[in-house]
Amino acid sequence: MDFYQPYYKLSTLVFKISFTLMSTDFEKLKEKIFKSSIEIVIFDGWSDKTLFEAASINEISFKDAKRMFPRGAIDLVKYYHEFEDKIFLAQFRKVDCIDLSHSKKIELALIKRFEIIVKNKEAFRRSMALFALPFYQIEGINLVFSTCDKIWVEIGDISVGFDWYTKRIILASIY
């Protein structure tokens, strides 16, 4: 993949360890920055400016914000997508869908996921615009594929091999 990927992973790990020693609220701080950034994204889009403005609202230094989101806006957008996946999974698990067929479960899961997207339409639209850029397309595809995989796993899919891939690709084309 990328030449700097091992360094990026190592520096993020070192920061998480050192930040955890300083504060046990690493994820809470990331969430605070993210939630503040949602309101800013509507006007400025997903950018480093948005990240730093959200950090300053929460009285977090730019240096620490950059350590939490090393690649700036793209890591913030990835966090946004993963955060909404967590919310989706929590809501979907509350629904009793044992008696439903796989297709009805998929339909219900997509409806739940789209309900979450609608709450922050503009942020979602701007994230899709960012992932349309050639150098971020692979990351966007990975996030969509990850969401589709989470949906199938949550439904209880146990397929392997070719079926595993085709189910996720078909769902990704719908999503």
Q: For the regions a protein language model found, what residue spans apply to each?
A:
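Amphipathic alpha-helical packing segments from all-alpha helical-bundle domains
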Residues: 135-157, 168-175
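Internal, conserved structured core segments that host functional sites
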Residues: 112-147
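Hydrophobic alpha-helical connector segments
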Residues: 27, 92-126
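Preference for well-ordered, secondary-structure-rich cores of eukaryotic proteins
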Residues: 54, 58, 103-104, 144
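Conserved phosphoryl-transfer catalytic core
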Residues: 83-92
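Short, amphipathic alpha-helix enriched in basic
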Residues: 26-53, 57-62, 71-78, 82
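Short, Lys/Arg-enriched N-terminal segments with co-localized hydrophobic residues
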Residues: 6-21
